[in-house]
Amino acid sequence: MNQYLAVTSNGLENLLVEELTQLGINDAKPVQAGVKFKATNEQIYRCCLWSRLASRFVRIVAEFKCQNDLDLYLSTTSVNWVNYFHSSKKLVVDFNGTNREIRNSQYGAMKVKDAIVDCFTKKNLPRPSISKDLADLHIHVRLHKENALLGIDMVGSGLHARGYRTEAGKAPLRETLAAAIILRSGWDASKPLLDPMCGSGTLLIEAAMMAANIAPGLQRKKWGFEALEDFEPELWASVKSEASVQGKRGVKKVETHFYGVDNDNRVLQTAKDNARRAGVEELISFTLGDAAKVKRPENFAEGIVICNPPYGERLGTHPGLIALYTAFGAQLKAEFGGCHASIFSSSDELLSCLRMRADKQFKLNNGALPCHQKNYTIAMREQNSVSNEGTQEILIAPDFANRLKKNFNKIGKWAKREGLDCFRLYDADLPEYNVAIDVYQDHLMIQEYAAPKDIPEEKAKRRLTDIIRAAIQVLDVDANNVVLKVRERQKGTSQYEKLGQQAQTMQITEYGVKLIVNLYDYLDTGLFLDHKITRRRLGQMAQGKDFLNLFAYTGSATVHAACGGAKSTTTVDMSKTYLEWAKENMQLNGQVGRQHQYVQADCLQWLANAQSQYDLIFIDPPTFSNSKRMEQTFDVQRDHVTLMTNLKRLLRPEGTIVFSNNKRHFKMDMEALHALGLNAQNISHQTLPLDFERNKQIHNCWLITHQS
């Protein structure tokens, strides 16, 4: 008998021990990400052919202490490789792990390859050739700290490749993981099984193969053990023939049925093709449909729903997933009372949206991604309680939901009267729900303020999930129109940095002016909502005047001035992107011509050198900036007098500067302004719109004129 290592994923060791025991192995012992055991050739052939959980089987030829490359080389040369395979065989070395001395797996693989080749050449035999793509044998090496395991892969490529799947959906499960999920679900193979988000059908096919007793390795064309000197082809043919007969008989005996539902017709066709190649197509019914509306099949008593819903790398990028899990959970309770469910996801927060209590839960990895599998018993429910399911969802966060309702009734009506289709609905009104929510027509932008360090991450995630669910429910908005961002304390121009490349813009209306916003690609959208009253006022002041807009951003103030009848406009910003955006905003409102100038420049430098004069100047500088493109830092509190000194030179005798900034507790240096011959009037309270009335320090705004 030889000693073997069955390789599997972390967390599946004990499940694999059970499987190997059923295959006739009596001494299986779990180790990290694997199981060790002894087996005859017949037993290992059977294990390779029948294991649904192992990714490979390795014949162990040596285990040794390995501190450095010399230990690795000497221990490898001590193996009599000539006894294992002929020199004509092509090899590749799969080296896994590093330690203090062997820091590179490629280097480790090279040392093992050199040692094996030297074993043959020292016996005056031809040297085996190395071929990554055409290898007959894979030499397997595991190195962890000072412990090394050296062996021969009995399989070759991973056992997850069953042969039935030539293409998959967007996020396919490995077949070995799918089999583990089926086994962990507690499914009784005599009961029907439904996957309402089946994708390419892997879960269903693996379950159907179990029910039909089809060996998962039957379709594999090449095995590593076939290249070994002790390979027994007749014995292997017998083991394989026996499995083939069992599979053909098994399909005919299966009485249970399998149901697959997916909302992508192309992927469903792939699933059907995969099932046909696996030999189980007659056992599975595939249907186009929505998981959130899935109906219970006939004769589904005591059946089980098993699925791997989408979960995304980051919860925040997929608010739609929260709505999906919420609706799916409600549908499970409405349609599948008395049945079981097993759901696999990387996100415990998304699983909580199902609003079901798990009977059991397991931790599994999908590749490197830690995941949860939760098993549920779905209680029988009375019909009238099911009909109320949707309205009960807002009770997850009742205080928050009620505040949203109250705000929308007040602010929504005001916005409609004012001719606004974008406004702030909620701004951390309740401390425990620390977000800002802005409405842009039929879209929501939820900005999460970074949670304090003393709030546990899991608690913050769960609360954010509740916020998104309640907002979708109360405001009746399509979950795909919800955008989530995390807002932290800004440094310099970080609020203008690009977050994505979706380029999904939309056109909004503000007091009759049309503007373009982008909810996806930047932290800010291209429009500061707190300045809507300021912009309207600029439009009212601009008739027949030469208008200057500094730190112009996307030029929304320029558009209001132009639409208000400005004789000319000059828009200055350092960003080429935002100036192009400003031009698009102007063109959208029919404001084109030479009287409208756009200048890409450092506003402070431009201001110091400018000679033209203006009747109306709007300047809304950053609180602080240290942009690499600026020659010096800027602090609005420190530098506002210098700013006014330069602005005074450009201001005509009867002109007005509208000066705004976002620094909390900003103090205007009235004495310095008076010395410059300027008057300043604080109009902050006049420019604060209703949707920002709870945040009176969102900005401060001043009218500055020459002294008479």
UniProtKB/Swiss-Prot annotation:
PROSITE patterns in UniProt: THUMP (PS51165), UPF0020 (PS01261)
Sample GO molecular function, one term: rRNA (guanine-N2-)-methyltransferase activity
GO CC aspect terms: cytoplasm
Subcellular location: Cytoplasm
Main location (coarse class): cytoplasm
CDD domains: AdoMet_MTases (cd02440), THUMP_AdoMetMT (cd11715)
A Pfam entry, by short name: UPF0020
Keyword Transferase carried by entry: yes
Database matches in Gene3D superfamilies: 3.30.2130.30, RNA methyltransferase domain (HRMD) like, Vaccinia Virus protein VP39
Enzyme kind, highest EC tier: transferase
Catalytic activity as recorded in UniProt: guanosine(2445) in 23S rRNA + S-adenosyl-L-methionine = N(2)-methylguanosine(2445) in 23S rRNA + S-adenosyl-L-homocysteine + H(+); guanosine(2069) in 23S rRNA + S-adenosyl-L-methionine = N(2)-methylguanosine(2069) in 23S rRNA + S-adenosyl-L-homocysteine + H(+)
Residue ranges crossing the lipid bilayer per the database entry: none
Domain THUMP: residue ranges: 43-154
Keyword Manganese: no
UniProt entry keywords in alphabetical sequence: Cytoplasm, Methyltransferase, RNA-binding, rRNA processing, S-adenosyl-L-methionine, Transferase
EC number in record: 2.1.1.173, 2.1.1.264
Family membership noted in the UniProt record: Belongs to the methyltransferase superfamily. RlmKL family.
HAMAP family registered for this protein in UniProt: 23SrRNA_methyltr_KL
Described function: Specifically methylates the guanine in position 2445 (m2G2445) and the guanine in position 2069 (m7G2069) of 23S rRNA.
Name of the protein this chain belongs to: Ribosomal RNA large subunit methyltransferase K/L
Organism from which the protein derives: Vibrio cholerae serotype O1 (strain ATCC 39315 / El Tor Inaba N16961)
Gene label: rlmL
